[in-house]
């Protein structure tokens, strides 16, 4: 029987645009000298940093008067969307909360907006860190102080600038559908996003960010944070890597239960479920013990929430982002099925025709597919791992050329795939690779739109277009073999190599060449006067001066024009087409339909 549940430490991810201060903020939280005392010391976990509640209350002070049952905050060390979307837990995001870092002087940038969209998709609470407040001209630094204390020390001009910049963020958030306010003015945390002006460089405002996160967890998340302390461990694999003397290891965020040395564990591999036993659990040594040769300290067990390194046999092929479960009291089959189902539950809606997507982790694959779905881009196949030769060949067989593409998120392209791409038979296939989802999608959309225009242009070029011409008086340069006459183009677009017909439908010959100002041209627009050579007729017999002639468009071309390109035709082309089809449909009402 499991003992009574306890409240675990909430897991926090830091997100935001490149260079807005995500890493600096994490570094400041990790290395804050204010809390580096023995009691309530900030401890370094594998892939995460634990800030205990004692440290938070000492930094801010305000929570000391409130009863707090959240043990602290566990920050995932890898900042950015990728960490957030990669780390899943039971179908949702592993992170319980997020900090979105925004440069208060630059405002929202594309990655900021993408972060907010991802958080909205996952229904994850977050706080805005309006960073680099110390860069505002005239700002007086008050190292590590809460925002309101440091704000009170600024002159009126600086205070006014801070207020203006905060309200610019409020306005932008409102445009994106979020209600927000400066954190000290928020009364309903469920309906308003808190904006905390801060400086990762000086530590100003940092206590407030931690306090707001604790407050959010305390008020709205105590139920979802309840775990069974002695229950079987459940976690998410951050990274799979080889360590000297240990072999293959897993960096794991444990979010439920307890994991012990000797526990049987189940984890997802590339194409199979892997069962193995925990050989050792390792924590990084504190900085004070850095001179000790061993980098890791061995522990017998670990309880959620924590970052831990797991050494075990048979870990080759484990997927980053995979769920990991401990087996207890004979529920092995149930756990295997649970892991299999969780991997299969990745929400990727596949279509018969679509792009091929690759990513380095399960969660990243799901995040990419969700964003593609939001842009109405269909996905035919979604797989974890690098881009292979098989992917390129498969993309080359996709019927719709606008989907002959592979999108690779945070994962490499193998050399055999590069070789396959160099084959002339695969020249129509493109690979888009990178570590930022919105950039990948922008690049693909730009390529697709260009390709669409090119295909339409090619289709247009192959079609015989409508034209109506009149033979001009005093412009018969040769009567036959071929007849050479001057004509005015009354409507449409005249092309070389097309057949001509009289208004009664009688075919009279084919245009061999068009000349304008003594130069051969392939086509000429309405209103122009040109000389044409016509194979077939004799002037004075089949054709005469002042005769009107139409380009005799094949029926199949008329069908394509009317169904697919009519909207792209100029008024002159449309009018001439209508005249020509009206003449044809006098005899056969269904001609060209």
From Swiss-Prot:
Give GO terms: molecular function aspect only.
Answer: GTP binding; GTPase activity; translation initiation factor activity
Pfam families registered for this protein in UniProt: GTP_EFTU, GTP_EFTU_D4, IF-2
The protein's UniProt keywords, in alphabetical order, are: GTP-binding, Initiation factor, Nucleotide-binding, Protein biosynthesis
Q: Which residues bind GTP?
A: 16-23, 77-81, 131-134
Region of interest (G2), residue spans: 41-45
Quote the PROSITE patterns the UniProt record gives.
G_TR_2 (PS51722)
Q: List membrane-spanning regions.
A: none
Question: What does UniProt give as GO cellular component?
Answer: cytoplasm
Annotated stretches, region: G3: 77-80
Region entry G1: which residue ranges? 16-23
Q: Where is this region: G5?
A: 199-201
Q: What does this protein do?
A: Function in general translation initiation by promoting the binding of the formylmethionine-tRNA to ribosomes. Seems to function along with eIF-2.
PANTHER family, A to Z: EUKARYOTIC TRANSLATION INITIATION FACTOR 5B, TRANSLATION INITIATION FACTOR IF-2-RELATED
Q: Which family does it belong to?
A: Belongs to the TRAFAC class translation factor GTPase superfamily. Classic translation factor GTPase family. IF-2 subfamily.
NCBIfam families in alphabetical order: aIF-2 (TIGR00491), PRK04004.1 (NF003078), small_GTP (TIGR00231)
Protein's recorded name: Probable translation initiation factor IF-2
Q: What is the organism field in this record?
A: Methanoculleus marisnigri (strain ATCC 35101 / DSM 1498 / JR1)
């Amino acid at each position: 029987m499991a003992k009574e549940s306890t409240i675990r430490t909430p897991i926090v991810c830091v997100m935001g645009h490149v260079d807005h201060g995500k890493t600096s903020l994490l570094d400041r939280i990790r290395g804050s000298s204010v809390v580096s005392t023995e009691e309530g010391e900030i401890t370094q976990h594998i892939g995460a940093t634990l800030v205990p509640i004692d440290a938070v209350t000492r930094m801010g002070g305000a929570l000391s008067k409130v009863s707090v049952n959240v043990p602290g905050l566990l920050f995932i060390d890898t900042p950015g969307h990728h960490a957030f979307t990669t780390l899943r837990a039971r179908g949702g995001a592993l992170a319980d909360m997020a900090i979105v870092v925004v440069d208060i002087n630059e405002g929202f940038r594309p990655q900021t907006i993408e972060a907010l969209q991802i958080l909205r998709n996952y229904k994850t609470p977050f706080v805005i860190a309006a960073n680099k407040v110390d860069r505002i001209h005239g700002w007086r630094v008050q190292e590590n102080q809460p925002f309101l204390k440091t704000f009170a020390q600024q002159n009126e001009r600086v205070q006014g600038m801070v207020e203006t910049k905060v309200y610019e963020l409020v306005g932008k958030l409102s445009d994106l559908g979020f209600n927000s306010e400066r954190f000290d003015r928020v009364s309903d945390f469920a309906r308003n996003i808190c904006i905390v002006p801060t400086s990762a460089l000086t530590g100003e405002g940092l206590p407030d960010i931690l306090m707001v996160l604790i407050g959010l967890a305390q008020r709205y998340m105590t139920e979802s944070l309840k775990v069974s302390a002695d229950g079987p461990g459940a976690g998410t694999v951050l990274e799979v890597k080889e360590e000297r003397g240990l072999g293959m290891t897993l960096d794991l965020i444990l979010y439920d239960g307890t994991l012990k040395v000797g526990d049987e564990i189940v984890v997802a591999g590339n194409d199979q479920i892997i069962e193995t036993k925990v050989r050792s659990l390792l924590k990084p040594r504190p900085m004070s013990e850095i001179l000790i040769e061993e980098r890791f300290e061995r522990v017998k067990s670990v309880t959620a929430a924590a970052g831990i390194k797991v050494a075990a046999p048979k870990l080759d092929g484990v997927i980053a982002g995979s769920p990991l479960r401990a087996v207890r009291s004979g529920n092995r089959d149930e756990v295997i099925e649970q892991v299999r189902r969780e991997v299969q539950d990745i929400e990727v809606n596949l279509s018969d025709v679509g792009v091929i997507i690759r990513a380095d982790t399960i969660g990243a694959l799901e995040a990419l597919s969700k964003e593609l779905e939001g842009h109405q881009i269909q996905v035919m196949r979604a797989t974890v791992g690098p881009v292979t030769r098989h992917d390129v060949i498969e993309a080359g067989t996709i019927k719709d050329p606008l989907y002959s593409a592979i999108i690779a998120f945070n994962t490499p392209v193998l050399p055999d795939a590069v070789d396959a791409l160099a084959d002339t038979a695969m020249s129509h296939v493109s690979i888009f690779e990178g570590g930022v989802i919105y950039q990948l999608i922008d690049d693909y959309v730009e390529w697709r739109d260009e390709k669409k225009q090119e295909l339409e242009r090619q289709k247009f070029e192959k079609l015989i277009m409508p034209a109506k011409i009149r033979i001009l008086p005093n412009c018969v340069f040769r009567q036959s073999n071929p007849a050479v006459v001057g004509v005015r183009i009354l409507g449409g677009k005249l092309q070389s190599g097309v057949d001509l017909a009289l208004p009664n439908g009688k075919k009279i010959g084919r245009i061999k060449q068009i000349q304008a100002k003594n130069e051969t041209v392939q086509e000429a627009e309405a209103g122009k006067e040109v000389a044409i050579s016509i194979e077939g007729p004799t002037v004075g017999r089949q054709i005469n001066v002042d005769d009107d002639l139409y380009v005799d468009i094949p029926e199949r071309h008329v069908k394509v024009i009317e169904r697919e390109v009519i909207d792209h035709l100029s008024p002159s082309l449309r009018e001439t087409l209508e005249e020509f089809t009206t003449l044809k449909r006098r005899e056969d009402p269904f001609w060209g339909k």
